[in-house]
Amino acid sequence: MLPLPMESMASLSMGEGGLDTQMSRSVFDARLQASLNAFSPIQGVNNHMGSKLTADRERMDWLMAQLAARQLFFVDSRTTKDTQAAFAAQALNVDSVSRDVFLDNERSTAGLEQEFKRALALARKQGSAVLIGHPYPESLSFLERRLPELEEREGVRLVSVQALLTRPH
């Protein structure tokens, strides 16, 4: 899965390959195609940051049109409550799923454990939960410790994101 840098409300640096709301359609499409081609083969994309871009329905439609053409899925990190990603994905027949919990906004052991337990509770209640984390040393260490015991101790099974994708009708 390609974490695609997208414009945030806070105007954080996106780095090379980022997509923003000021781009014309041709620039947006060219930048997106370059990113997708640079990291192929991939199966899907998620937004890295992106609170401003994912709230822009027109640009989400542009994004989903390219993902649909390549039969790629989209994982919405839900960095804003105003995200339009799921609506655009459904309209353009792109398989998608949205984040339920961020694991590592707080990287302390207590913070990681709190969010992990929140995800477990949601998974039990809803039948699934999408937990997004980053490759921080603290997060990796936490997951190395907790994942091996997940099914036996917690009664929750880890699955790939593809198993949770919502297929548009």
Where are these predicted regions, by residue range?
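Catalytic-site microenvironment of enzymes
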Residues: 1-169
